[in-house]
Amino acid sequence: MLKAEKLPWARAKCFKASALLGSEYECNVRLDELHLEVHNVGLRLTVNNRIVQQDFLKNMSISPKSQVEALSEWAPVREGDYLFTGTPKGVGPLAVGDDVKAELFWKDGEVISSFFATCV
């Protein structure tokens, strides 16, 4: 309904049970640190050990800080929440059995946080 009414995508896609996730993954950096380090932090997605998406936060059309501020105007944002912010170029289909790994990493390559799942 929200999409049909041309309301913001976030409101069209964010509702209870809209995304099922596996185990929680630790992140060894705080969100306020990411706000200061957007030039040094990147996102990478591999499917079956092949990099399909990779870019740095500085290249996002809307910064993480701006996204959190805008979302906070109409929804509570709490520590531990997952925020789906869009992705770098390279969006593509997934198939049953695909191994998917998402990583948040420092510019020097050190991984800050990672998530792994197999599509079912």
Regions of interest found by a model, annotated:
Residues 1-82, 90-120:
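Catalytic-core "active-site belt" of small-molecule-metabolizing enzymes
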